[in-house]
Structures are given as structure tokens and as C-alpha cells.
Amino acid sequence: MIYKTGYPRPSTDYGFDFEVLFKQMFKPASWYGFGVGGHFSAQTYSLHGVAASGIIKQYPENADIYKEFLNYGNIGIDIVNRFYLYGDALYLDLRLFGDWAFIREFDVKYVMPGSAVSTLDRFKDGSRFLPFQAGVEASLGSGSLQIYFRYRFTNMFNHSLIPLEPERLSAGIKLEFN
């Protein structure tokens, strides 16, 4: 599958995103609030076929590559706009975020034929994985529960070295504690 950027998208088995966001909200009107904040997030993508393609490293053809993970650990800043619908019962958040990835690694686990020992290759080459990410998030919430959609504007890979790009759009459920 080809992305709008023209770069192939790696086959993603699954992924997860864990985030802790601290924000200070202000409510100047009954229908509107805004805030600023900071966050820590961890993202993991379980990939399939990237290592076998030889983009990261040339593996022997007979190597059994059974796990591939792309891991990011980020700290970032946020600007949040909140629109209250039906009083405080339902709200829509529009959030801009900017991240710096202090952890950027690609892990590959494989076994050579005739061996019972698995090998882990961990690539932390900063020139391959870009440290800055930015995007927008929209979430609809009631009480502490929110459904969100997040779009990342920036690339995760240096496309001159790794011509791939993971999904830019993600969706999920968030819990907010006040």
C-alpha cells in the first residue's frame, strides 16, 4: 500500500500508545476553555516484513525473523481548545502537540536455522529515526472518558535512509482525571 507521501507503509500487526498529559485549563466562557500542558508518551508499533526487506540491515535469507518493533519515547508540549456542548456534559477537545523523541529504536528478533538461541538487534541510529513529531488531535468526551483521533503531520523516518512511514492516523480511548 502506498501512502500519499509516496512511501510504502510497513505492515503493522498492532500498536499502542501510552500517554500521561499534565495540563492547566482555563474557562473564560461557559462554552469554551483553553489550556497548555506537557506530556510523556510511549509508542510501539509491531511491524512485519521491514527487517526482511533489508532496509534496516541485510539479514541472511534463511533467518527466521519473528518480531519487529518500532519504539518511541517522547516528551512534548500541548495547546488545548475545549468546546463545551450541552453544558459540561459533553465536550470537544482540539489539541496541537509537539514531541521530541528521546527514545527512538527499532528492535528485530530472529533465529538462525539449527539454532535454539534467538538474537535481538536493536537499532538506535538517530540519523534513521527523526526526533521531532507534531500533529493534531480531536477528542469527544463526557466526564472522564474520551474517544480520540490523532493525526501526525511529521515523518518518523528519514526517508533518504528508510523509505517507509508508519500510520499517521490513530484512534483510541482516553481517560482524563481531574
Residues covered by each model-derived region:
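Structural signature of outer-membrane beta-barrel domains
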Residues: M1, S41-L47, D99-I103, R150-M156, ...
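Residues that define the transmembrane beta-barrel architecture of outer-membrane proteins
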Residues: P10-F18, S30-Y32, N71-I75, L130-A134, ...
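Short loop/turn motifs that connect adjacent beta-strands in outer-membrane beta-barrel proteins
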Residues: M25-F34, L85-L90
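Early exported N-terminus immediately downstream of N-terminal targeting peptides
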Residues: A29-G49
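Membrane-proximal helix-loop-helix units in multi-pass membrane proteins
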Residues: F83-V111
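Predominantly the C-terminal beta-signal and adjacent terminal strand-loop region
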Residues: R122-N178
